[in-house]
Amino acid sequence: MNKKIWAVFMMLSYSQWTPKKDHLYFDDNYWDEFLEKCHDTGINMIVLDVGDGVKYESHPEISLKDAWSRERVHSEVEKCKKLGIELIPKLNFSTGHSYWMGDYRRMTSTKPYYDFCSDVIKEIYEIFDGPRFIHLGLDEESYITSRVSDYVIYRQGQLLIDDIRFLITETNKTGALACMWHDPITENVEAFTKAVGPDEVVIFPWWYWAYTNERPYKLITDVEDMYANRGITCEQDVPIRVNFLKNILPLMEKGYKYIPTPSNFYGVEDNTDITVEYFKNGSPSDEQILGFMTAPWLTTTPQHKEATWESLDLLKAAREKYYGK
């Protein structure tokens, strides 16, 4: 069996969740301490949410004032390599997380937008010294997740699938393999599988609620309330849950490969153990599980050390429990 990926998601830029920032939320000293912790807990990959956090030559207008230079990125890639860690860039082309694009966010699905996407994908591959993967994000693109924004935009149906197809093609042309969250796939299984083959993408499923009735836990309160406002009060009736649990394992029968991604962000500490167990036992072949990634969903700053360290320890514990030391 090939060596599993044991990854952690971290942030360089924070402009993917809120209106575009003017600086990084990133502490250099804490980052170095974090890398040592990763090495100590067996992490062999960091997926770094880059966004506008590097200096783009093709689109300098989107880069933050303290964005990393090419030289800085190269030094960090080499630093990680010495610790046995791959540093993988992540962008996010979901309209719910595209503030980092600046004005291009408002040009979604137009020629200037496609040109921009192609440019930054090619450049991020070069900046990160030819990484094995490029993560494209693509989570939480819907009315529900967009409606709190001042400028609401989201794609659906065939347009969404066509844009995903374009992004994957542009990524794989670089030599990297495209990665993405599961969200638009489990909502559009037939259209997605017709458009994108199992060898063209790695899927990162995330799920912070109950996988089975045998191991239930409470739905996250704000999401529960959001659906209650629409007249849906039973967890089993939540559409995103129904579609996820209905489709996520059967997709593997078609040959798609996964890196499932648990989190401790909502205080559900057993999500990591449950996620590793669910996919290890439920996949048709363990070879299709390339590994697992923990996502603390926190800025790379020292006030989040306790929760970030916990996420790493939880992944280590699950790895040792289900895959051995």
Task: List each model region and its residues.
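Hydrophobic beta-strand segments of well-ordered beta-sheets in folded domains
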Residues: 4-8, 44-46, 134, 200-202, ...
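Aromatic-lined carbohydrate-binding surfaces of glycoside hydrolases
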Residues: 9-202, 207
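Alpha-helical scaffolding within the catalytic cores
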Residues: 119-121, 185-192, 239-249, 275-278
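Extracellular/periplasmic catalytic domains that process cell-envelope and extracellular macromolecules
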Residues: 1-3, 127-128, 194-198, 251-253, ...
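N-terminal hydrophobic targeting/anchoring segments and the immediately downstream early-domain regions
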Residues: 1-32, 41, 105-110, 172, ...
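Substrate-binding cleft of secreted/luminal carbohydrate-active enzymes
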Residues: 247, 254-325
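Charged, glycine/proline-rich intrinsically disordered loops and linkers
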Residues: 34, 217-239
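Substrate-binding cleft/loops of secretory-pathway carbohydrate-active enzymes
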Residues: 105, 178-227, 267-284
